[in-house]
Amino acid sequence: MQDDLKNAPIGFFDSGLGGLSVLRKALEMMPNENYIYYGDSKHAPYGEKTPQEIRSLSFNAIEFLIKKGAKAIVIACNTATSAAAHDLREYYKDIPIIGIEPALKPAIKLHETGSVIVMATKATLTQEKFKNLMDKYGEHREVIPLPCPGLVEFIEAGNLEGEEVKNFLREKLNPYMDREISSIVLGCTHYPFVKDVIQDIVGEKVDIIDGSSGTIRELKRRLEENNMQSELKKKGDLDIFNSLEDNKILELSKKLIEIK
C-alpha cells in the first residue's frame, strides 16, 4: 500500500456534534492517525427524520469526506448506522466503513440481574438493526428502550449541565428509578456528553456505557487487516468541518473534543 494512502485521514461523520465522543476515543486509542470530522449540524437531529432522508444525508457526508481524501469512514452516529450503513457499504465497496450500534451485549454481560435502559433516538429504536439486537440479547433480561427526543438539541446548543437539561433527564429517567437498573446504554453518540448528569440522577451503582470503544477497536482491526495503518511517528492532524459553517459550532466542537 502506498505510504500517502496509509497516512491519509480517517473520516468521521455524525448528524452534528455527537460523533466527537467517538472521535475522542479514536484520538486516545490511535493518536498517530490523521482525522477529518464532518458534523451535519445544519440537519440535526437525524433521529426524527425518515430512513430515506437519513440515507440521503449520509451519502452526502461520505462524499464530502472522500473528496477530502479519507481512507476509511466511521459512521459516528447510531441513527445513520441503523438507517444507512448497509447501503453505504454496498455503494462504497472499496473503502472500509465502520458503524456504531448500542452496546447492548456488553451491558447485559456486565451484570447477571437488573434491567438495562437503552437511551437513543426514535429512529435508532425503531430500525430493524435494533430489533435484531433486542431479539439476540434481550431474551432473558428486561431491556427498556427509552427514546429521548429533544436531548440532541440541548447538546448541539452546548447545554451539557444546565438546570434545563437536568430536568429533562430527570423527567425521562425518574419513572424507572423504582426498578433494579443495572446498566444504561447510551445509544446515541451525543449522549456521552451528558453522562455525568445521567450518573448523578441514577447513582454510582448503575453502569453507563456506550459503543465508542468497540467501534474504534473494529476500525483498528479493519485498518490492520487491509494494511492501512498510519506510519506517522508523531501525533496526527485533525480537521473539523460542519455543514453550518459557523464559527460558534466549530469552537464548541473543539471544546467537546477536549472534555475528558
Curated annotation (Swiss-Prot):
Active-site residues annotated for this sequence: C77 (proton donor/acceptor), C188 (proton donor/acceptor)
Keywords tagged on the record: Cell shape, Cell wall biogenesis/degradation, Isomerase, Peptidoglycan synthesis
Disulfide bridges in this chain: none
Pathway assigned to this chain's UniProt record: Cell wall biogenesis; peptidoglycan biosynthesis
GO biological-process terms attached to the record: cell wall organization; peptidoglycan biosynthetic process; regulation of cell shape
Pfam families in the cross-refs: Asp_Glu_race (PF01177)
Catalytic activity: L-glutamate = D-glutamate
InterPro entries per UniProt: Asp/Glu/hydantoin_racemase, Asp/Glu_race, Asp/Glu_racemase_AS_1, Asp/Glu_racemase_AS_2, Glu_race
Enzyme class, broadest EC rank: isomerase
Transmembrane spans: none
Binding site for substrate: D14, S15, Y46, G47, N78, T79, T189, H190
SUPFAM superfamilies the record matches: Aspartate/glutamate racemase
Family: Belongs to the aspartate/glutamate racemases family.
Protein name: Glutamate racemase
Species, as recorded: Clostridium perfringens (strain SM101 / Type A)
Encoding gene per record: murI
